Swiss-Prot record:
Family according to the record: Belongs to the UPF0303 family.
Protein name (record): UPF0303 protein mlr5144
Species, as recorded: Mesorhizobium japonicum (strain LMG 29417 / CECT 9101 / MAFF 303099)
Amino acid sequence: MAVADDIALIRKQEEVLVFPAFDEAVAFKIGSAIRARAIAENLPIIVDIRLWDRPLFYAAMPGSNASNPDWARRKINVVRRFLRSTYRMVLEQQRPDRAFKIGEGLDVSDYVLAGGGFPVTVKGAGVIGVIAVSGLPEREDHGVVIDALCDHLGIDKRGLVLASEAE
């Protein structure tokens, strides 16, 4: 799939994966589903779900490491700043160094171009938070979030899931 096609599909994900409401219980349910998948598939990830003012869910799986929370924090900052998926930002920016252009004024210690951060959007309210996964290749981090959101919202994944890079 071409980069432009992936960007278009991620935009569609951002438009479709919208919550009617989002609170601690919803965050726990989604976080727990991601954690259960990680256990079942031995995924060495961390998951961090938060509103802008506070964390709601966090889990670190065996095999994750000390750098994963920092990667997640920097992904969270990108979603907060740009109100869009970090993987979409990766594809739009096409920067091999994973840093934003100097003119953006974004410190590499606080912002990173890496997939796995996805906005929590509530109908009528807009983007209120973020779900971040770190520990897998960025396209897979992104996919873990998308799968969980589709499952939670009861949305058919067909037509929303990115093809694997091998395809």
